[in-house]
Amino acid sequence: MPYTKEELAVLLSGSKPLQLAGCDLSKADLNEADLSKANLSGANLSGAFLDQARLRYADLTKANLEDASLRKANLHGATLAEADLSDSDLRGADLSGAKLNHANLSFSNMTDANLAGADLQGAKYNRHTHWPADFEVQAAGVIMVK
């Protein structure tokens, strides 16, 4: 069962870093939330709103971020290994130093995102994935899927 807006407010006002592994945060409004260093491994964030959220060094291993909005989110150094980012909006997001190995990036939009130093080895994408201008897809070790 997803959290209500009131429950989220209480949760986010607690001590950091947050321990939210496996939590159902689907469709949650987390715009501008500070989730730095949070443990969100295996969490369901499908359809969540995380625009301008701070997720620096957060653990999002195997998290479901399908159809999530992460515009201008700060994901510097975050771990998104094996995360499902399909159909997510990452326009202008800071993914510098992030670990995106084996993540699903199909249909995602990373226009103007910062991928400097990001580990994308084994990540999957399709012809509908939008990359930042001048991003060298071949050199990143990503895998094209149909």
Where on the chain are the PLM-derived regions?
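Tandem repeat scaffolds
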Residues: M1-K146
